Structure formats: structure tokens, C-alpha cells
């Protein structure tokens, strides 16, 4: 089975769906919103071609569920707010939004939510239906998605860590697995494995930057948010917990060791310095803003659908309930790729053990994601300067 067929979130609206388990990502978007607003402010001041008539925006790796349209709403509201601040008396521009993700993404569930979004934008922003046009653009952001110099603003949240393929070189010339008992480039992985993952990320991210530079207008903006390498004090990350859970099943004889050794997740969390160096070496973009922030990976447990902190309940301080919440999120992201390799029957057992291990980490006050926000502007052509 092709990687792109299984590298997607759980669709639909069931209990294991991404739509039902993405409150953590809502919190990330809320943290990024002030930077998004500043990005839009700089974009509108740059006075790009046609920007007063139609602003073209894309969400790269949009996934499905309410978070997809939360990004759209935040972008539209930021545009309208900044225009008001600038006392722009011209007629509101149409905003054209493209939602992009791999072909297997559940775009249909997103389309079902559009009427509600349009009503909300009309009520809160006075935007009449038809002044914000939303369409899907299925495809991989590791290749071209849009015509040359056609876009004003590109946004991506929590997608860039996914690679276009499992790195080559993870099996030796003798047919021996180089990344034994591991499922990604962990701290315990041998140096050749870590290098293979870094090389693949470098290739993918450099290609991503080059493709986006071709699609953006000169001085267009791009805002990226991704997980980056953390510190020792953060504790094991969720990929470590997933790896532990699968290893537990191998020890119990529920899974064969060869099945584990042949499984590698196409994901790489780069360091801040790696990302910064790659942007500078590719050369198409200027870094306008770069910041990191930490979030506990159970942070989404304590917020409601509007990103407000819920009143404390007996469950709030229960590490097992919080760990189960984290397990549900990770299952909604990785179940398709896990089920394609290990089979669907073992999935509940994997995430039962995941939750058990996560509870131990949470009890110790550890378990953090380190996040990177980076705002970029496409460098002007010499003729535009």
C-alpha cells in the first residue's frame, strides 16, 4: 500500500476520529493567532498585486474536523481586523482559501461544516456569503500545488514533521534492520539512522520551500508551526510512548519482533537550528519571526471547543483520564498507518499500553511538546526592489 494512502488522520466524526480528538491542536492555533495577525498586518502593508480585490490563502496540511475551519476563521478575522486598523476604506476584498492535504484526507467532513462557518463569518464579521470562497486542493505539499506567483499567504500547522517517504538506508547491505526495536529516529537510534532521517527531512523541507517560493507572489508571507526537538527535561515524547507500547506487545508475544523492526514512521522533528539553517541555505525566504513555546501534550484535556479552560472536575487531576485523552489524540493521527502494518485488531491494545505509559509520565509532571513558530517573507526579485 502506498504511503500517501495511509498517512492521514482518522476521518468521520466517530470516537476515534481526529475531529473528536483535536482539542490540543486548537490550543496550538490559539497560541499562534497573535503571530498570524501580525503576519497578515505585514502582508497587507506590503501592497501585493491584486490584494485589494482578492486575497489568495492556503492551509497546507489542513486535516479534517473543526480545526480546519478554525484556521480559516482566524485568517479571515485577522484580515478584516487589520484592514479596519489601517482604516482601509476600499471595498472588502474577496478571500479565496484553498484547503490542501493528501488525497485520502476526509475533505467531505470539512465541506459539511462550511455552511456553519459562512453563517458565523456573516454574523461576527459582516462578511456576506460569497465574499469568502473555500475550495479543496488535494495533493502533497512536497510538490507544486498552485500556479506560479499566484498566492498571497500560506499557512501550515503541525504538518511539516511528516516526511514524503520512509528514509532509505534503514536496512543494511546484509538485510539487517538498522533501527531495531525503534519506529522513528529516536535518541536511541544508531547515528546512521538519525542521519538518514535528517537527510530525508532536509530534502523534503528544502523542496517544500522551493515549491512555495514558486507559488507565492514576491513579498508574500508564509507562517509555519511545527513540533521541534525538545529538552531532556521534557520527558519522553508521544512517539517514544508509541514505541514503548509496541515494544511491550513484542515482549508479551502479541507481536513478532520482525514486525516491529520493519516498521518506521515517516516523521522527523527537527531542531530550531536545523530549520533556521535550511531556510537560510535554500535562500528564497527571509525569516521575520521565530519563536518556540512548550505545551504539555495533555494540555487539550482541560479546554472546551472554544479553547476556554474548563472548570476543574474530579477528572481534571486524574492522570489516567488525561493519559487516555492523549492516547485518543495520537490514535486519531496514527491509526491508519499502524493498522496498515500491524492490523486493525491490535490497535486497541497498542493504545491501552500507550495510555498506561503516558499516565506515568504525566504523574511525574513531564510530557511536553516543544513547538516552533516561524514567519517567512518571500524575498523580492531584484527587479522588484
Swiss-Prot record:
Keyword terms: Magnesium, Metal-binding, Methyltransferase, Transferase
Binding site for S-adenosyl-L-homocysteine: 18, 62, 67, 101-102, 140-141
Transmembrane segments: none
GO biological process: methylation
Cofactor: Mg(2+)
Pathway terms, separated by semicolons: Alkaloid biosynthesis
Residues carrying the site annotation Involved in substrate discrimination: 155, 267, 344
Molecular function GO labels: metal ion binding; methyltransferase activity
Cofactor binding note: Binds 1 Mg(2+) ion per subunit.
EC code(s) of this entry: 2.1.1.-
InterPro entries reported for this sequence: MeTrfase_7, MeTrfase_capping, SAM-dependent_MTases_sf
Binding site for Mg(2+): 179, 261, 263-264
The keyword Transferase appears for this protein: yes
Stated role: May be involved in the biosynthesis of caffeine.
Protein family membership: Belongs to the methyltransferase superfamily. Type-7 methyltransferase family.
Stated name of the protein: Probable caffeine synthase MTL
Lineage start: Eukaryota, Viridiplantae, Streptophyta, Embryophyta, Tracheophyta
Amino acid at each position: 500500500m502506498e504511503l500517501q494512502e495511509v498517512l492521514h488522520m482518522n476521518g468521520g466524526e466517530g470516537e476515534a476520529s481526529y475531529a473528536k480528538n483535536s482539542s490540543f491542536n486548537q490550543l496550538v492555533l490559539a497560541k499562534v493567532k497573535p503571530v498570524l495577525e501580525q503576519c497578515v498586518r505585514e502582508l497587507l502593508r506590503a501592497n501585493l498585486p491584486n490584494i485589494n480585490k482578492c486575497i489568495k490563502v492556503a492551509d497546507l496540511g489542513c486535516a479534517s474536523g473543526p480545526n480546519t475551519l478554525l484556521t480559516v476563521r482566524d485568517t479571515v478575522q485577522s484580515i478584516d481586523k487589520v484592514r479596519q486598523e489601517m482604516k482601509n476604506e476600499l471595498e472588502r476584498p474577496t478571500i479565496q482559501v484553498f484547503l490542501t492535504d493528501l488525497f485520502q484526507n476526509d475533505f467531505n467532513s470539512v465541506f459539511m461544516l462550511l455552511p456553519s462557518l459562512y453563517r458565523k463569518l456573516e454574523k461576527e464579521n459582516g462578511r456576506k456569503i460569497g465574499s469568502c470562497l473555500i475550495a479543496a486542493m488535494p495533493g502533497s505539499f512536497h510538490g507544486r500545488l498552485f500556479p506560479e506567483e499566484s498566492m498571497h499567504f500560506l499557512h501550515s500547522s503541525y504538518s511539516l514533521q511528516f516526511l514524503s517517504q520512509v528514509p532509505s538506508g534503514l536496512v543494511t547491505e546484509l538485510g539487517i534492520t538498522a533501527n531495531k526495536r525503534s519506529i522513528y529516529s529516536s535518541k536511541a537510534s544508531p547515528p546512521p539512522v538519525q542521519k538518514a532521517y535528517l537527510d530525508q527531512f532536509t530534502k523534503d523541507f528544502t523542496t517544500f520551500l522551493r515549491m512555495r517560493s514558486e507559488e507565492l507572489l514576491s513579498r508574500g508571507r508564509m507562517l509555519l508551526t511545527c513540533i521541534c526537538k525538545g529538552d531532556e527535561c521534557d520527558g519522553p515524547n508521544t512517539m517514544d510512548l508509541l514505541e514503548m507500547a509496541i515494544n511491550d506487545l513484542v515482549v508479551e508475544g502479541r507481536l513478532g519482533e520482525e514486525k516491529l523492526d520493519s516498521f518506521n514512521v515517516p516523521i522527523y522533528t527537527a531542531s530550531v537550528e536545523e530549520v533556521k539553517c535550511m531556510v537560510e541555505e535554500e535562500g528564497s525566504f527571509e525569516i521575520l519571526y521565530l519563536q518556540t513555546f512548550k505545551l504539555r501534550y495533555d494540555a487539550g484535556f482541560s479546554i472546551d471547543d472554544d479553547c476556554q479552560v474548563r472548570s476543574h472536575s474530579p477528572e481534571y487531576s486524574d492522570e489516567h483520564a488525561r493519559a487516555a485523552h492523549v492516547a485518543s489524540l495520537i490514535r486519531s493521527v496514527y491509526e491508519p498507518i499502524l493498522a496498515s502494518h500491524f492490523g486493525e485488531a491490535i490497535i486497541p491494545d497498542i493504545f491501552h499500553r500507550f495510555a498506561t505509559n503516558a499516565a506515568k509520565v504525566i504523574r511525574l509532571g513531564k510530557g511536553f511538546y516543544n513547538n516552533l513558530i516561524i514567519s517567512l517573507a518571500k524575498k523580492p526579485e531584484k527587479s522588484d526592489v
